[in-house]
Amino acid sequence: MAREEVISIPEIAAILNNYRIGKKPLAKLLGWGETTIIRYMDGDVPTKEYSDKLKMLLNSPLYYYELLLNYKDNLTDVAFKKSKKAVLGKMTESRIRMTAQFFINYYHEEITALQIQTLLYFSQGFSLGFYDTALFEEEYRITTNNCPYIALFDELSCAPLRYFELDEKIFTEKEEKLLTEIAETFSWYGTKAIQKLAEKERSTLKISRDKENNKVVTENSIRTHFKKLMEQDGIKELSDIEGYIEKAVLELKHEKA
C-alpha cells in the first residue's frame, strides 16, 4: 500500500484529540491489540483495512459515535463518558449536521439519509425565502444521485441514524418553527414522492460552477428561486408550506398520468 494512501500520524492524533480518547482505549474500542495505535503513532504502517477504518473515524463523528455506543463495554465508564461528550460536541459544530439531526429526532430515527437531503434543501430554501438567512453554509451541489449535500449524505450513510438530544440553543425559535413545519409537511409523503419532488426542483434551479469546477446552485440562486415561488404561490406564512408541497406532489401525479 502506497504511503500516501495510508492515514498519517497527524490524522491519527486528530482522532485521539477530537474524541478525547487514549491510544490503548481506541485500540480496545476497535477490537484491535492494545498497542496497535501506539505502534502506528511510532511509525508502523497500517494495513489498508485498518487505515480505512481509522479514516472513517476521522471523517465521520457519527461513525465513531456508533462504534462508541456499540463497544462501550471495552472502555472504563470514565473513558466512555469523556469520549461521548467529545464526539457529541464535535457533531454539534456542524449546522447542517444538526439540521439533519433535528429531522432524525423528529421522525424517531424513521428517516433515511436520502430523504434528509430533500428536507435540508427545502429548509434552506424557505429560510432564505422567509428570513434572508441560511440555515447552514454548505452549497447545493449537482450530483448523479441527487444528493446536493453529498458529504453529509456519505456520513449519514455509514452508520445507523440515532437520536440524541439537541441543545435548545442550537436553533432560534423561528428556525425551530420552520424545521418543524417542514418535518410535519413531509411526514405525509413517502420516499418516492419526496425524491420525485427533489428531481423536479433540481430541474428548475440555476446551475453554476464553483472554484473546483463542480456544478453547484449558489445560496443566492436558491434565495431568488424561493422568493419567486413564494410570491407566485402566495406563501406568506410557514403554514402555507404544506399547501405548496401538496400542490407540487399532485402536479407530479398528474404529469405521470
Task: Identify the residue ranges that each predicted region occupies.
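Short alpha-helical "recognition helix" segments of helix-turn-helix
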Residues: 15, 21-30, 37
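Domain-edge interaction signal
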Residues: 3, 11, 35, 39-257
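A short, Lys/Arg-rich alpha-helix, primarily the initiator
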Residues: 1-18
